[in-house]
Amino acid sequence: MTRSVLVPSSLVREAEDKREATRKLGYVARAAAVFRIDRVVVFPDEDGERQWGGGFVETVLRYAATPPYLRKEAFDTRDELAYAGVLPPLRLSSWTGSDSSGSGSLRQGIVTQVGSEGRVRVNCGMQHPISLHEPPGMAVSEGERVTIRVSSRRPVRAKLVDDPLPGFSVERTGLGDALDRSDAGVRIATSRHGEPLSVASLGGYRERIARDGVTVAFGAPERGLPPMLGVSADAVNESVTDSSADAPARFDAWLNTIPDQGSEVVRTEEAVLATLGSLTLTE
């Protein structure tokens, strides 16, 4: 089961300066961490972009999703990261080791050197890079991020494993490609024109998400998903009122997850928190 969040490249379009734009992206990263999101996708919305576009959004989110002990290794000095200091700490359990089991905790690492005889050196936040055997059938290259299972710190005992990287990944791809993934699960578009999410309807979505996973797409301030996708509000409303009508733009459902909003504009980072908080409720 995979949980994915899709955000537009115009996400920070109303930010007054780079500091505020960075802080907004930090809130999105925090939401992804808190609600155990596996993948954050930045999809293009060039018509809605202003001063900071998809490259900025992707870079800041990638930086936030990188464990602090790897950031210096993974990122050089970049203009996009001028205000990275305002990003809130994510403190993912997979980074701190508090999510470990009896077989050891998973950590991200970066391959710093590929040697001979199937050995590689990996920076994984220990005092020094550690030397590990490359498992049979697993080929890694210098600079690649890898997953390491640490069973002991003193003395250091660890091994490379072919598991997904701990935390959430960040990528930049088209909305259609993200929806077409085999692990997309329930594909939900968020919009004020969608079906108001209620206690009655939440149960059905919760069961499907627990079984199949979920992909949730969000719009940008003053520019929701309908105009981004060339979908009319009437088409969205029709899919809500007519149970026989298909949801537009290849989604399974359009949901209004803040049905009684008290502000004219809901910011994307606010919508992400409200939506994920609702969809991850348990009985």
Swiss-Prot record:
Domain of life per record: Archaea
- Disulfide bridge partners, by residue number: none
Q: Which Gene3D superfamilies match?
A: 3.40.1280.10, Nucleic acid-binding proteins
The cross-references to SUPFAM superfamilies, in alphabetical order and at most eight, read: alpha/beta knot
Which InterPro entries is this protein grouped with? Alpha/beta_knot_MTases, NA-bd_OB-fold, Put_MeTrfase-C9orf114-like, tRNA_m1G_MTases_N
Membrane spanning residue stretches: none
PANTHER family this protein is in?
Answer: CLASS IV SAM-BINDING METHYLTRANSFERASE-RELATED (PTHR12150), METHYLTRANSFERASE C9ORF114-RELATED (PTHR12150:SF13)
Identify this protein by name.
Answer: Uncharacterized protein VNG_1688C
What is the native source organism of this protein? Halobacterium salinarum (strain ATCC 700922 / JCM 11081 / NRC-1)
